Amino acid sequence: MSLRNRLFQLTLVVLSLAIGMQAQDTQHCSNATLHGSYGFHATGTGFVAVGRFVFDGNGGLTGKLFIRVPGTNIGPLEFTGTYSVSPDCTVTDNWLDSTHVSVIVDQGKGYFIMNVSPSTAAADTLNNGEGRRQ
């Protein structure tokens, strides 16, 4: 095989990979991307929580959480809230008087979440959380 043919084949492979990567980067999300039931866990300093969220695909959510802080079990806490998904697959939600930001992963099969409500260093216990579609 000539050098010219090899370069042509290499160019086709690189071009195909670039197109495939661009297709993955252009995923567009909406409220409908986040729908159904998701198992949830979060950990922090002196804090752990597990629970379940149900997203309706239209910006509404319900949840049930069980929380453990040193020496105390809290819950179940049942609540409702709202969420908004941006085209870049980031999420802002509000529930239990807190605001959170999330990133949808794995084509809507999960998300990573962080509490962004105003707090003090002493009260800031949530480090990270994750939800997975059930």
Predicted regions mapped to residue ranges:
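Mature soluble binding/inhibitory domains
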Residues: Q22-Q134
